[in-house]
């Protein structure tokens, strides 16, 4: 009887999974068409290893763009960490959970039933790669000081590489309040991995991680090289 129930549950979930796959493919195609995002891999490569990607945050579309530029095999195992309050409602929650497989975090302490670091740590224990935004909110210029979550993940999972990711131009491609994209090149640059050093203090690590993210920003030569490489391909 138990086997029959499990089989029935799997059958009932099949249409939902199929819809999520179709919608995920459609979103990927749409994001590439609208924003033409390009991935630059500097100091690392798109490898099938568990990682924590940590990125700057200037737009609501940031994690979708990073998700879109990852190779399909890496995309399937990468879980973005996102604010639960933004992904409320039936459709948004379906997209977040079923399409992006996001780890949804409550930003307001009084509404939390789970510790955010514990939620992320469980996902890592389950084999997921995470995409997080350590600033904790969108910045309109520069990079805000990092919250402590990245440090706690580095301490709990010292063997997992932490890869800085710089998202460039997305806030200008689709300015706040606009619905028509501006034709600018959007790049996603992946930098050299870092780890928590032995005995490294929290503040020192967070400063070093922030500096690593800033150092990942692409130069004009990097973008020109990516354009030439794509044209040659």
What are these regions (language model features)?
Residues 1-19, 84:
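Compositionally biased, charge-rich terminal segments
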Residues 19-20, 24-57:
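Helix-to-loop junction immediately C-terminal to a conserved catalytic motif
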Residues 50-52, 129-133, 163:
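Residue-level preference for the first positions of well-ordered beta-strands
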Residues 219-233:
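Short, flexible loop/turn segments with low-complexity composition
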